[in-house]
Amino acid sequence: MDLIDRISRQFEDSAQTKLAAVEWMAAPIAQAVEMMTASLMNNGKILACGNGGSAADAQHFAAELLNRFEMERPPLAAVALTTDTSTLTSIANDYDFVQVFSKQVRALGQPGDVLLAISTSGNSPNVIDAIQAAHEREMHVVALTGKGGGRIGEMLSPTDVHLCVPADRTARIQEVHLLTLHCLCDGIDCLLLGVEE
């Protein structure tokens, strides 16, 4: 095996996946940017959740909004529901791991807030439960998935936004997810700050 060739193929495959995704995802990403910006401008907040690498993505996104992305601006209201180990373990222990995000959504979510629900397969039970809780709280949902969207794609309401990566390989989906999150951050900043370029 030639490691250099293998690494080169990884880069090429990643680039091709991203280029193929833009045709499907640019318009819904723009819709998600507008939804999130409208919520933030109306004193709403964004709650984000996911498992494993998607949990890291939820935290990354919340950090970019709370601190800053590439432009100076005031902090924005975003909370990753993946970070409080006492809350996560108490819910998982006393109830069920399926409820680790939904209980937080029911406690923190308000009408007009946005839930960013991340699942590469679209089938994560605790993310599905969080979406159901968000709907109960009259929140908007932006779902970031892959592999056809799974059960999440089937349960979204017409007012939700589905950002589904047209790929089946988890690593490639995660790479497009990160780029998508950066596009969301950039778009929110541009709308809030009136950037025209």
Curated annotation (Swiss-Prot):
It comes from the Bacteria. Its main location: cytoplasm. Its cofactor is Zn(2+). Pathway: Carbohydrate biosynthesis; D-glycero-D-manno-heptose 7-phosphate biosynthesis; D-glycero-alpha-D-manno-heptose 7-phosphate and D-glycero-beta-D-manno-heptose 7-phosphate from sedoheptulose 7-phosphate: step 1/1. Zn(2+) binds at residues 60, 64, 174, 182. Residues 36-197 form the SIS domain. NCBIfam families: PRK13936.1. This is Phosphoheptose isomerase. It comes from Azoarcus sp. (strain BH72).
